[in-house]
């Protein structure tokens, strides 16, 4: 081998030995075997030689190219192995260290209450229905026999939104989930048996009221429905929810524009101790009544053929009563300590309906 080829071999091997990372290794590879590399330049010179000289010189250059290619590839593999070993050493896990304690989340008490309501009413044959949070004035008020002068329709109680472009129909953030009942009666044939849990909105904010809160309404439409069905349904629900088969339940006359007759539902309660089911006091928990004939007619149902009852309750209120939560605002303060205390385990399903 001529002196220049031996010099190229020694210099390349020395550069490879000095390379410690991919960048330095790649610089040696390109400088030797690349398009402008030193070995490539020697191959280009072969074209200017005589056939006899080209044969001898070409054989020597090709042997050198093969040798250097093997050396470069071998050094590249060594560098990759060293990089991998360094990364594995940095990521090494000490298996003798103690295991980190596991922590689990909790289901928000409002979510759990809605699950329990769905479970209890589901055992009675109800299904869950949903509807939009933004309702038309007609679905939220007019179809429910709410007169134009009713205080609930004022902007002090209701959040009004601009009408859709090209229409004059007013829109509101729904003040109740009753609009779901209207949409169900318009879209389905009786018999109907639904509950409609969801968010509702009213312009009110204090320790017991929130601008956004959750409500669950229910509706039953069928032939021959009477007050006895309403009382039996709600009594069974309240006793199952509060876990007291002997819970005192009282129905007293009231007024709602969409039901006739209308009734408030109270449960036995001790004002002194706050115990549900104990004492001589009564605590109002929900409203109910027989669906007003005008509401049935507004939804295309003949009141002489179809009857029904409806009810509505605040989900936060029932949750506060059962868990002894004093302030409604704490539901939305995102306090992890509070949630750990009042939240439910995600591994514990809502099976209260088994007590019915």
UniProtKB/Swiss-Prot annotation:
It is found in: Cytoplasm. GO terms for biological process: phenylalanyl-tRNA aminoacylation. Its EC number is 6.1.1.20. One of its GO terms (molecular function) is tRNA binding. Binds 2 magnesium ions per tetramer. It catalyses: tRNA(Phe) + L-phenylalanine + ATP = L-phenylalanyl-tRNA(Phe) + AMP + diphosphate + H(+). Mg(2+) binds at residue 260. Keywords: Aminoacyl-tRNA synthetase, ATP-binding, Cytoplasm, Ligase, Magnesium, Metal-binding, Nucleotide-binding, Protein biosynthesis. Pfam families: Phe_tRNA-synt_N, tRNA-synt_2d. Its cofactor is Mg(2+). One of its GO terms (cellular component) is cytoplasm. NCBIfam families: pheS. Belongs to the class-II aminoacyl-tRNA synthetase family. Phe-tRNA synthetase alpha subunit type 1 subfamily. Tetramer of two alpha and two beta subunits. HAMAP family: Phe_tRNA_synth_alpha1. This is Phenylalanine--tRNA ligase alpha subunit. It comes from Gluconacetobacter diazotrophicus (strain ATCC 49037 / DSM 5601 / CCUG 37298 / CIP 103539 / LMG 7603 / PAl5). The lineage of its organism: Bacteria, Pseudomonadati, Pseudomonadota, Alphaproteobacteria, Acetobacterales.
């Amino acid at each position: 081998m001529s002196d220049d080829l031996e010099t190229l071999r020694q210099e390349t091997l020395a550069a490879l030995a000095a390379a410690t990372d991919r960048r330095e290794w790649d610089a040696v590879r390109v400088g030797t075997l690349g398009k402008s590399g030193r070995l490539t330049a020697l191959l280009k010179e072969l074209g200017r030689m005589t056939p006899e000289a080209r044969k001898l010189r070409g054989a020597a250059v090709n042997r050198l190219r093969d040798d250097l290619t093997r050396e470069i590839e071998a050094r590249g593999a060594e560098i990759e192995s060293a990089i991998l070993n360094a990364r594995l050493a940095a990521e090494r896990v000490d298996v003798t260290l103690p295991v980190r304690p596991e922590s689990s989340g909790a289901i928000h008490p409002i979510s759990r209450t809605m699950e329990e309501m769905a479970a209890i009413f589901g055992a009675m044959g109800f299904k869950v229905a949903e509807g939009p949070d933004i309702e038309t004035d007609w679905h939220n008020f007019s179809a429910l026999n709410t007169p134009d002068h009713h205080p609930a329709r004022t902007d002090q109680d209701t959040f009004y939104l601009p009408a859709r472009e090209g229409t004059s129909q007013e829109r509101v953030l729904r003040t109740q989930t009753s609009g779901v009942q209207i949409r169900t009666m318009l879209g389905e044939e009786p018999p109907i048996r639904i509950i409609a849990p969801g968010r509702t909105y009213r312009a009110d904010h204090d320790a017991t009221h929130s601008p956004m809160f959750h409500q669950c309404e229910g509706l039953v439409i069928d032939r021959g429905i009477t007050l006895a069905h309403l009382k039996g349904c709600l009594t069974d629900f309240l006793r199952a929810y509060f876990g007291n088969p002997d819970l005192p339940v009282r129905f007293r006359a009231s007024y709602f524009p969409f039901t006739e007759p209308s009734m408030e539902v109270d449960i036995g309660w001790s004002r002194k101790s706050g115990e549900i089911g104990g004492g001589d006091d009564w605590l109002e928990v929900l409203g109910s009544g027989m669906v007003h004939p005008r509401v049935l007619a507004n939804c295309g149902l003949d009141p002489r053929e179809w009857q029904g009852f409806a009810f509505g309750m605040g989900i936060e209120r029932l949750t506060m009563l059962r868990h002894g939560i004093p302030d409604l605002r704490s539901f939305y303060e995102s306090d992890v300590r509070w949630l750990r205390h009042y939240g439910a385990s995600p591994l514990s399903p809502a099976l209260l309906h088994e007590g019915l």
